[in-house]
């Protein structure tokens, strides 16, 4: 199971990749493995505001429905429309093709509350 070093991670198993004042958000390889085959992804609309630690969408697998929790606060500026037709990308490419949303960061200090790859890996191994 991989946890790219250039990402930050939340306790709820979301990842964040920061590019300038924008953050790409998705779920980790650990989360998709726990969920099993993803069959549907529900995401917010462009223009919506998400709040750190609050639900912003959900993923449905053959096993369960799981809420997605915002790792940062911001305004949604892009949604990955590919996931509507191909939710299985979350299983096959959780860090590359299956980013879920892009937000304009409201407060970069929130990133300090997230874990680096080593801390996240230690948490999921407990």
From Swiss-Prot:
Its cofactor is (R)-lipoate. The gene is gcvH. Disulfide bonds: none annotated. One of its GO terms (biological process) is glycine decarboxylation via glycine cleavage system. SUPFAM superfamilies: Single hybrid motif (SSF51230). Belongs to the GcvH family. Keywords: Lipoyl. The keyword Iron-sulfur does not apply. The glycine cleavage system is composed of four proteins: P, T, L and H. It comes from the Bacteria. This is Glycine cleavage system H protein. GO terms for cellular component: cytosol; glycine cleavage complex. It comes from Brevibacillus brevis (strain 47 / JCM 6285 / NBRC 100599). Binds 1 lipoyl cofactor covalently. Residues 22-104 form the Lipoyl-binding domain. Pfam families: GCV_H. The modification N6-lipoyllysine is found at residue 63.
């Amino acid at each position: 199971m991989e946890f790219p070093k250039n990402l930050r991670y939340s306790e709820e198993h979301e990842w964040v990749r920061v590019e300038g004042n924008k953050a790409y958000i998705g779920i980790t390889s650990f989360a998709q493995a726990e969920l099993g085959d993803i069959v549907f992804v529900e995401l917010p609309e462009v223009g919506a505001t998400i709040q750190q630690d609050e639900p912003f969408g959900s993923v449905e697998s053959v096993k369960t429905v799981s809420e997605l929790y915002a790792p940062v606060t911001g305004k949604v500026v892009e949604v990955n429309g590919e996931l509507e037709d191909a939710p299985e990308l979350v299983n096959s490419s959780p860090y590359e093709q299956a980013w879920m949303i892009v937000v304009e960061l409201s407060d970069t200090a929130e990133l300090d509350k997230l874990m680096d790859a080593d801390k996240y890996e230690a948490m999921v191994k407990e």
